């Protein structure tokens, strides 16, 4: 069974994940779990999906899913139409996609903590380029939770992690198009 979903979210770069944890616990947010996620992003050799604002991925972590996303224009929030299907075997699904011509594959690694508070999903993500809070829900609730977490709405990020990675790699002279921890091991902090 698949689900179609209208996704609205924002992310914020954070320096102090501990502070976010403390605030979430103080407000009795429900902790769902922590996991290492690996995402394989697929496209044609000519990047046809990316050019159309579309995104196809397989993600392993809390569960194994294949997801198709399509951008919706929104200046204040990251908004997408999403179709997601839980899959049993990510390796076989990858083989199917590659045989259909989706041979360009990019990899993203991240550690994700999932929380629920005030009808929003709050993810604390650790990626090679930093830590982020991602808040998903309805716009009003996203704003309320961002304020509760002491996140400045003006500093919200609507770019996806791939766009942020492209900026980060240019600034730091990294050649990898894959968002992997091994790519940043030599960067001096």
Predicted regions and their residues:
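A contiguous pocket-lining binding segment that forms or flanks enzyme active sites
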Residues: 124-129
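Acidic (Asp/Glu-rich), glycine- and aromatic
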Residues: 142-154
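N-terminal strand-loop-strand beta-hairpin
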Residues: 1-121, 155-189
